[in-house]
C-alpha cells in the first residue's frame, strides 16, 4: 500500500514538477519578462529573452539580491540591460503569491498587457496557477532547470505548497 502511494506521488511529481504542462515557447513579444526570486538559475533564461528583444522591461523579484544574488544586485543598480529597463521589486509578503500580487499591481501601474514569468521548472505549475489568479493579461510561465540533487527537496516542498493553494488559499 505504502509503495503504491509513493509510486503515485513520484508519478505526480514527474508530471507537475519535472515535465509540467507546456505553454510552448516564449512569445515573440511581451511587455515584461519577470524573474521570480529563489534561485539564481532563473536569471540566465530571462536575460536571453531580453537579449532576443522579447520585452522592453526586465522585472526582478529581488529579496535575495544583496549577498545571495550579486548579478541581480548589479542589474538593479544599473537600471538597464541590453536596451531594456530593469525594474526591481520586493514582494510583500515574500512568497509566490506575494510576487503574483505585486506583479499584477506593477502591470496595472505600468501598462504591461502581457508578461513572461521565468521560474524554476519545479515551480511552473504553482506559479502559473497563482499568476493566473492575480494577473488578467496574456501570461507565459517558463521554467529553468534545477540540479538533480535538489529535486527531492523541491518536490516535497512544492507538493505541500501546491496542496495548500488548491485547498486552503484559493484566491489571489
Q: What are the functions of these language-model segments?
A:
Residues 1-16:
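Hydrophobic membrane-insertion alpha-helices, especially the h-region
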Residues 18-156:
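A structural signal for short, hydrophobic/glycine-enriched beta-strand patches
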